[in-house]
């Protein structure tokens, strides 16, 4: 074993104990590419394609494919796979009944993207129906079709296809390729940097001052920060990944020690499942090699569907079984009296001095053409966001 591999062993084990790798190369890839020409095809939407990628690259370890019915029922009802491994979100592949009837159990299905590129193969082991309202209630905590994750669920086909997958071609990530690392690569990077303890931070928003505060608070206790923004499918009113990625680069360059933070994309779709998605986010960062994970206010939430600290409360129940330490932070604010960031734990001043920050407020101000005040955002970040949105609005 090389010195780098030995260092990797000192870091956290993947979820389930083994880092899954279902991405084919060399002769096996060529064999499947040849075989795929005679297979029935299925076109994946962006959401399912990102799931395929994260199963294949190990981000969703220990999953090796789309979930069968036993795992599915166990996940939605008991927050674990059928073998007892903690898992909170069903990773499934839905089709309509007519499509499902065209596929025979035991056959392989060629998986194409909406761009007609062949990305993978599914070895079909199961087909099963499911109750959409039951899944919505148990996973999202609501059956309200106005919830973006529930809306997506209700629009899906009525049958789930299940079985192991192989990825033949990795999806392109356009301008973000230099920030793409799979879990094997992040683990190697952490080892080369000499990081033994790493905190992961999930975001779909630009980094505002509250984010910076909790990231740096966590950095006081660990060797490094993995800033791991989601660049997959999000709501239409979320700030685009292109603008956000530029803002992340700017803030890391100007306000973080170069040897203490790394920017890596998380190529997943956003489910907006709040507490249940917080658990999934922790599992994925564990697979990427993080020893710690930050859960702040209303993690992975949307609207008023979840309580401010509901995600923290739920993930605390599973922290020991998850095998990753959770940093839980209160709602941070800028205190105009302190002239600094703080929380109720560190600031003695009244609410009239507190400027509360959130991704929603940042988005609202930007869309209204308002300059972000220094209490909200670093000026370099504000400039990137204003220019980016202005450019988007004129296109």
From Swiss-Prot:
Enzyme class: transferase
Record keyword Ribosomal protein present: no
Known catalytic reactions: sulfate + ATP + H(+) = adenosine 5'-phosphosulfate + diphosphate
Family statement drawn from the similarity comment of this UniProt entry: Belongs to the sulfate adenylyltransferase family.
GO biological process: hydrogen sulfide biosynthetic process; sulfate assimilation
Record keywords: ATP-binding, Nucleotide-binding, Nucleotidyltransferase, Transferase
Enzyme Commission (EC) number: 2.7.7.4
SUPFAM superfamilies: Nucleotidylyl transferase, PUA domain-like
Listed pathway(s): Sulfur metabolism; hydrogen sulfide biosynthesis; sulfite from sulfate: step 1/3
Name of this protein: Sulfate adenylyltransferase
Pfam families from the UniProt entry: ATP-sulfurylase, PUA_2
Cleaved signal peptide residues: none
Entry superkingdom: Bacteria
Keyword ATP-binding annotated: yes
GO molecular function: ATP binding; sulfate adenylyltransferase (ATP) activity
């Amino acid at each position: 074993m090389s010195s780098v591999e030995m260092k990797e062993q000192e870091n956290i084990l993947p979820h389930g104990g083994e880092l899954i790798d279902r991405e084919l190369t060399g002769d096996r890839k060529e064999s499947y590419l040849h075989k795929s020409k005679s297979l029935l095809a299925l076109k994946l939407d962006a959401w399912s394609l990102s799931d395929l990628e994260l199963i294949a690259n190990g981000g969703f370890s220990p999953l090796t494919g789309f979930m069968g019915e036993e795992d599915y029922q166990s996940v939605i009802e008991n927050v674990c796979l059928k073998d007892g491994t903690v898992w909170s979100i069903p990773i499934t592949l839905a089709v309509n009944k007519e499509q499902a009837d065209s596929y025979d159990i035991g056959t392989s299905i060629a998986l194409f993207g909406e761009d007609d590129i062949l990305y993978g193969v599914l070895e079909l082991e199961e087909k099963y129906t499911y109750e959409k309202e039951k899944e919505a209630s148990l996973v999202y905590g609501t059956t309200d079709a106005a919830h973006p994750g529930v809306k997506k669920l209700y629009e899906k086909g009525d049958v789930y296809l299940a079985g192991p997958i192989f990825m033949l071609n990795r999806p392109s990530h356009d301008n973000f390729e230099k920030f793409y690392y799979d879990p094997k690569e992040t683990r190697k990077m952490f080892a080369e940097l000499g990081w033994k303890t790493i905190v992961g931070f999930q975001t779909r928003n630009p980094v505002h001052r509250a984010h910076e505060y909790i990231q740096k608070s966590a950095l006081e206790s660990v060797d490094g920060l993995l800033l791991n923004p989601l660049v997959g499918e999000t709501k239409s009113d979320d700030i685009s990944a292109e603008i956000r990625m530029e803002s992340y680069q700017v803030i890391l360059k100007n306000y973080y020690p170069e040897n203490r933070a790394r920017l890596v994309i998380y190529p997943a779709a956003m489910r907006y499942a709040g507490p249940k998605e917080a658990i999934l986010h922790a599992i994925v960062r564990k697979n990427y090699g993080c020893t710690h994970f930050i859960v702040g206010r209303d993690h992975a939430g949307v609207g008023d569907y979840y309580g401010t600290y509901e995600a923290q409360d739920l993930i605390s129940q599973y922290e020991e079984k998850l095998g990753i330490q959770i940093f839980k932070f209160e709602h941070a604010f800028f205190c105009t009296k302190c002239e600094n960031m703080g929380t109720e734990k560190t600031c003695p001043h009244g609410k009239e001095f507190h400027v509360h920050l959130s991704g929603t407020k940042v988005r609202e101000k930007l869309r209204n053409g308002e300059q972000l005040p220094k209490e909200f955002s670093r000026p370099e970040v504000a400039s990137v966001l204003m220019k980016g949105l202005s450019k988007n609005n004129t296109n």
